[in-house]
Amino acid sequence: MPDLVAYTDGACSGNPGPGGWGALMRAKDGDTILKERELKGGEADTTNNRMELLAAISALEALDRPSTLTIITDSAYVKNGITGWMHGWKRNGWKTSTRKPVKNVDLWQRLDEAQSRHTVTWEWIKGHAGHEGNEKADELARAGMAPFKTGKRGKDG
């Protein structure tokens, strides 16, 4: 069975401001890429963290059956949230340890639901450090943001 990897990234011009997300999905056999799919989208008024979350959500929601995959993100916010903080948030009724509402709770809950159908390994890598898959996800995120920087609207995947 091939390895499934998703590189995800978000981008924002201003924070908040126009933003985009990108995901590069790859089925691989060792170093050989068997299949590749590019996803992207954006919003007119958003934050970088929301775009990072939407990139991961979109990668998971694009899968048409339960899968085992690795999601590679340059967002410590997403990686730490899904692998650590979320357990406490759920236990506390989606409140932080200081009893404040979790920011972006709508997307965290959607990510939790999307992940529940799959077996996911989460990896963090340094952004803008020459990782080919991450650089491509960044390009997709910027392309997803582009229509919103000029006032146009669009999404494809």
Swiss-Prot record:
Q: What is its EC number?
A: 3.1.26.4
Which spans are transmembrane here? none
Entry note: cofactor = Binds 1 Mg(2+) ion per subunit. May bind a second metal ion at a regulatory site, or after substrate binding.
Q: Where in the cell is it found?
A: Cytoplasm
Identify the residues that bind Mg(2+) 2: 9, 138
Give the matching NCBIfam families. Answer: PRK00203.1 (NF001236)
Query: What protein is this chain from?
Result: Ribonuclease H
